[in-house]
Amino acid sequence: MTEGRRCQVHLLDDRKLELLVQPKLLAKELLDLVASHFNLKEKEYFGIAFTDETGHLNWLQLDRRVLEHDFPKKSGPVVLYFCVRFYIESISYLKDNATIELFFLNAKSCIYKELIDVDSEVVFELASYILQEAKGDFSSNEVVRSDLKKLPALPTQALKEHPSLAYCEDRVIEYYKKLNGQTRGQAIVNYMSIVESLPTYGVHYYAVKDKQGIPWWLGLSYKGIFQYDYHDKVKPRKIFQWRQLENLYFREKKFSVEVHDPRRASVTRRTFGHSGIAVHTWYACPALIKSIWAMAISQHQFYLDRKQSKSKIHAARSLSEIAIDLTETGTLKTSKLANMGSKGKIISGSSGSLLSSGSQESDSSQSAKKDMLAALKSRQEALEETLRQRLEELKRLCLREAELTGKLPVEYPLDPGEEPPIVRRRIGTAFKLDEQKILPKGEEAELERLEREFAIQSQITEAARRLASDPNVSKKLKKQRKTSYLNALKKLQEIENAINENRIKSGKKPTQRASLVIDDGNIASEDSSLSDALVLEDEDSQVTSTISPLQSPHKGLPPRPPSSHNRPPPPQSLEGLRQLHYHRTDYDKSPLKPKMWSESSLDEPYEKVKKRSSHGHSSSHKRFPSTGSCTEAGVSSSLQNSPIRSLPHWNSQSSMPSTPDLRVRSPHYVHSTRSVDISPTRLHSLALHFRHRSSSLESQGKLLGSENDTGSPDFYTPRTRSSNGSDPMDDCSSCTSHSSSEHYYPAQMNANYSTLAEDSPSKARQRQRQRQRAAGALGSASSGSMPNLAARSGAASTGGGVYLHSQSQPSSQYRIKEYPLYIEGSATPVVVRSLESDQEGHYSVKAQFKTSNSYTAGGLFKESWRGGGDEGDAGRLTPSRSQILRTPSLGRDGAHDKGSGRAAVSDELRQWYQRSTASHKEHSRLSHTSSTSSDSGSQYSTSSQSTFVAHSRVTRMPQMCKATSAALPQSQRSSTPSSEIGATPPSSPHHILTWQTGEATENSPIMDGSESPTHQSTDE
């Protein structure tokens, strides 16, 4: 079956569509393809059927694949029929004329195939309307008799009831003569009016038997289910309207319906089941029973949809309007796709999986086409009006020119056959221009070309001059560059000489721009040699000094690397080149001595700005006394201390980077390294290098971003030292169980480089004592992660409900389908599910919530949440027998109240999120205070302590954010700002303990404090 199967679809206009159906093609897609051949919009009334082995029509289920249906086991292509599946009261409710035409063709086909029982006299009258629609008015008896043999007008049963064919033809001719003057549309409308009045119209008949084996006809329509005598399809014996039915189900050879009968009284109190419910059962082969069940469900859904949409249905059109429209449109229009592929009565379709060409055309409505045509017509009129105005303006301009010159221009617009107007020249318009004052066009273009060449050559000369003045090159290369510079000057002088010649010819003064460039080049070469000597002296003084973040008013403004976004644009003129040359002295050399490489003078504009004052050295040394560590940091090269240089060391031969351990028995101070201004892309790559694992609470490395006074970036990294197992910080290693740590960089913060110092031993011991006092609140596995939502046993239970999905899955042979059920007084439909397999199935007609063990409304009954009290039994959803669904089961918790399971989980999540948000707000306030109070040594140590504690805990924040966003409800997640989700954890040790355990602390001033209005609104 992988190569597909050939199918032949019989259309209502006697055409046949042949196509190769692919295995994955759905029945809905096949219906779209067939409908596209009629440009059909209202496809909901139609379906595709096939004749099964019992001789009954079996309809394709639109949500299943075509080849999954049980087709007859015959050779050759599968025969399918496109016809009407759902009927309505009148064609006046149909919107499109094509739909009315197809209903007419379907009615003719059903009567001719004897699917509808019709009296013989009615058949003769209907045949006359068919002749009037196809052939027009009556002409002669012979023509009518020949037409009746060609048209499908007289069914076989009507011919059998009468002695001869001539009698039947005479009766048709009598009716046909009375229809003279009727249009085609009127004939169709009158035909459908008669057919719609028939009691058997719109009913699908199925042959069944009852328990005694008596044969019956079971009729299904949009009105309900009817039971007919086997020899009489007109008058039903039993009528079951859809509003009376409760449930529909089948099992193998049995089809049953539960009918609500209010007149039926209960016999005794011991009666099982409902007293007002009567069950009716019919029997047939399993394939036919399943087909009846599927048709009953589809008819009930169509009944509900029409009942729900009656208020939205537009006013029905009158039959006279429909007749006029049908007459004007003519015969049924087929699509271009059908005409292209048709050969006589057979349409050769392509692969059934290619549906886009037809479905797009069928989806466009007639009203949309009319609107498009109206818009195009209005656009055409606007363009024609604009063209007329432009032509009038052109005529006026041409006439004015003709009055001045005495000759009508050739651009004057003339209509076909129109003679050009005669225009007289005005008096006094003749004059003569001075030819000497007009510059020839060739000389003007030559001067412009020379000016462009001079601008380009001046930039080339300036670049050659800068290369020639570079002192860090060899003598040979310097000589070559000097020669190139002299040649560029010579060419520049030649271009200027040519420009001056042209300027003298045009009466302008000559220029001397090339000589100025030569003089500037000589002065610049002398200045560059002097500035290089000054830079070398300045390098010696800078390398031996220890630099702090407060030395420069720029607070460590880094030398900008020659990147694309920091490089200044090239000068566009000679003045820009001269200004750039004069500004070169504002930059200073890098403090690094060139060792393996040397900087050229071309890099000078990208180096850091000269220091404006040197008094920052003494102030910084007073504020931070020099120690051994300071001296070591100052003497070593700043580039080697930079985190960029040390990255390969961190990622050396191991997937787990080294853990920075912090000593607490030596004084610690802040040392600055050489800052590097990096782009956001480079910052993200650095963040990947800084990811590492840690087993100690205090040694969690984190890149903290903070804003300093001038807005310059500072990047904080912990200094790595040898670890000591006896450090007090290591005692908290049992409180954490992180396998990895993520780093978060807020978008509004600038990440900066600087070395983060450790705390003093007294501060560490103080924090250790605080942790020991709050050790009872610490859990072995909580440590800042999501709160545990599992139910707690014993006295520690908080009453939070637990949603545990059971692992029971519906069997693979069952198919669960959902249908919308509209309940009286409800605006939104209730989802009703039907359970279907090859052997049995169930469908609820009314979605009533019951608690009985019988077949209920699609399994949609429920029991309320019950509290187990002291026994510890929790409420449980009782599954229905009618369906197999995954239902939530509750944990065994005795502290529940009724209906408190979902509320407890939501309340616990809400409290945890509010605690973390409040802690973040207090931490932001403390961080801001500590960052602004850095003028004294004591204040700076306080800031370092708070920042360090926050630094050791902040690595867990991204995991908290991910868990929070996953656990919160969708409405609360959508209304939570991203800045609050990605917040930094609290900075004080007390808040860290609260953060780790996820429990509220009674004496915390923040837990009693502000609760964000946004979160309050979302919680409610």
Swiss-Prot record:
Location of the protein in the cell: Cytoplasm, Cytoskeleton; Cell junction, Adherens junction; Cell junction, Tight junction
Subunit note: Interacts (via coiled-coil domain) with CYTH1 (via coiled-coil domain). Interacts with PARD3 (via coiled-coil domain). Found in a complex with PARD3, CYTH1 and FRMD4A. Interacts with CYTH2. Interacts with CYTH3.
Phylogenetic classification of the source organism: Eukaryota, Metazoa, Chordata, Craniata, Vertebrata
Region (Necessary for tight junction and adherens junction localization): 565-920
Domain of life from the UniProt record: Eukaryota
Pfam families: CUPID, FERM_C, FERM_M, FERM_N
Keyword RNA-binding: no
Keywords noted in UniProt: Cell junction, Coiled coil, Cytoplasm, Cytoskeleton, Phosphoprotein, Tight junction
Name of the encoding gene: Frmd4a
A GO molecular-function descriptor: protein-macromolecule adaptor activity
Annotated Pro residues bias: 556-572
Main location per the UniProt record: cytoplasm
Name of the molecule in the record: FERM domain-containing protein 4A
Coiled coil: 367-401
Keyword RNA-binding in record: no
